């Protein structure tokens, strides 16, 4: 039997413009995943893309990755990796991660499918990879999957690594390929790009392990339902079995949408509800308030809560509809009620008519004339 760890979308080096602690969060969860690999005594690691948050990572990101590779290399744990859409080198540039190939890093399929045969515990394993292909490379992707199918013929144990969004697992309009385009003669298909955990039996076992840390508040629901984690895969006689391991160093996030009267209580309520899951790190709260309240008042209120970090709150003010005389059907009366200015009402009527006529030049002339008058 062969055992390996599958992780993806670690986004090492990602930062927040407003919360300084976020950069360290991505390092923490990546390093935790590496420690899990060592504790599980895996034979190798699969990383299916977006290792770094950018194709030109900073020195601190490179140092974190170098230290991890040295630790893995000391234990003879190689890493097989494809590029995602974030860390794929531009044109003829070299890969940042590639300088650590001497520490056991194998980059597969930069511009086309590539595969490698390795032996672990006396068992031959074929590992193939295709880096992210979108834009002008999208039309090439199906052909690369066909190459992958041909290359793995004759291997009992095989793994395909790919960083793509697949229909119907993801939104069809944002996908580069369909599940049916994948080669079905692999034991395990290690996907990357989606940040939530997905496991599917499609013939072979397919999985997106998801990101190791949240990149946006769209991932909050997935975090609260399943957590963030990595996959430990046992591969034996062509059959892959998946064991999910949750990461403990993930910083929790919450989204609270409320009104000026109740937002503080709702924040306290959700923090109490998930108190046992949050862990040592203060969670981040993304607050949206619907109603009339000043930002200064909100900031003063939030100082009363010590157990969370807050992104800049959003205040969505409710705009009162103009009071139009009952039974009115005149557009001018609507403009007058809303603008409360005769001159602006005249301008609005003219711009409306020019818009209806499709006369862009007349609209520009009216606007320019108004600017000169003022």
Curated annotation (Swiss-Prot):
Active-site residues from the entry: 86
Residues where Mn(2+) 2 binds: 50, 85, 163, 193
Listed CDD domains: MPP_Mre11_N (cd00840)
Keyword Hydrolase on entry: yes
Presence of keyword Transport: no
EC assignment: 3.1.-.-
One annotated GO molecular function: DNA end binding
Cofactor note: Binds 2 manganese ions per subunit.
Residues engaged in binding Mn(2+) 1: 9, 11, 50, 195
Keywords: DNA damage, DNA repair, Endonuclease, Exonuclease, Hydrolase, Manganese, Metal-binding, Nuclease
Regulation: Nuclease activity is regulated by Rad50.
Transmembrane segments: none
PANTHER family, A to Z: COMPONENT OF ATP-DEPENDENT DSDNA EXONUCLEASE (PTHR30337), NUCLEASE SBCCD SUBUNIT D (PTHR30337:SF0)
Assembly and binders: Homodimer. Forms a heterotetramer composed of two Mre11 subunits and two Rad50 subunits.
Family that this chain belongs to: Belongs to the MRE11/RAD32 family.
Primary role: Part of the Rad50/Mre11 complex, which is involved in the early steps of DNA double-strand break (DSB) repair. The complex may facilitate opening of the processed DNA ends to aid in the recruitment of HerA and NurA. Mre11 binds to DSB ends and has both double-stranded 3'-5' exonuclease activity and single-stranded endonuclease activity.
HAMAP family: Mre11
Protein name: DNA double-strand break repair protein Mre11
Species, as recorded: Thermoplasma volcanium (strain ATCC 51530 / DSM 4299 / JCM 9571 / NBRC 15438 / GSS1)
């Amino acid at each position: 039997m062969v055992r390996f760890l599958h992780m993806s979308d670690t986004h090492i080096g990602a930062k927040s413009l407003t919360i300084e602690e976020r950069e360290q969060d991505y390092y923490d969860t990546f390093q935790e995943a590496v420690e899990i690999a060592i504790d599980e005594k895996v034979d190798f690691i699969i990383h299916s893309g977006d290792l770094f948050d950018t194709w030109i990572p900073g020195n601190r990101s490179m140092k974190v990755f170098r230290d991890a590779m040295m630790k893995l290399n000391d234990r003879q744990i190689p890493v097989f990796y494809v590029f995602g859409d974030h860390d794929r080198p531009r044109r003829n540039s070299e890969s940042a991660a590639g300088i650590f190939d001497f520490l056991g890093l194998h980059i597969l399929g930069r511009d086309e499918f590539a595969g490698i045969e390795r032996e672990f515990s006396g068992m031959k394993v074929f590992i193939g990879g295709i880096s992210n292909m979108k834009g002008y490379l999208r039309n090439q992707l199906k052909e690369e999957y066909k190459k992958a199918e041909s290359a793995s013929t004759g291997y009992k144990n095989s793994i395909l690594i790919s960083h793509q969004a697949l229909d119907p697992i993801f939104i069809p309009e944002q996908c580069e390929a369909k599940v049916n385009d994948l080669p079905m003669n692999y034991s395990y298909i290690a996907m990357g790009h989606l940040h939530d955990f997905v496991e599917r039996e499609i013939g072979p076992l397919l999985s997106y392990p998801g990101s190791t840390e949240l990149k946006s508040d769209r991932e909050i629901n997935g975090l609260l339902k399943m957590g963030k984690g990595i996959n430990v895969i046992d591969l034996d006689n062509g059959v892959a079995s998946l064991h999910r391991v949750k990461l403990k160093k993930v910083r929790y996030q919450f989204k609270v949408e409320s009104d000026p009267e109740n937002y503080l209580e709702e924040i306290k309520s959700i923090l109490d509800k998930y108190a046992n899951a949050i862990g040592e790190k203060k969670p981040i709260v993304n607050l949206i308030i619907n109603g009339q309240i000043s930002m200064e008042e909100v900031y003063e209120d939030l100082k009363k809560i010590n157990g969370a970090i807050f992104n800049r709150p959003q205040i969505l003010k409710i705009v009162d509809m103009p009071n139009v005389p009952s039974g009115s059907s005149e557009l001018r009366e609507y403009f007058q009620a809303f603008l409360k200015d005769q001159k602006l009402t005249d301008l609005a009527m003219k711009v409306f008519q020019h818009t209806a006529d499709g006369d862009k030049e007349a609209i520009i002339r009216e606007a320019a004339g108004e600017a000169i008058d003022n």
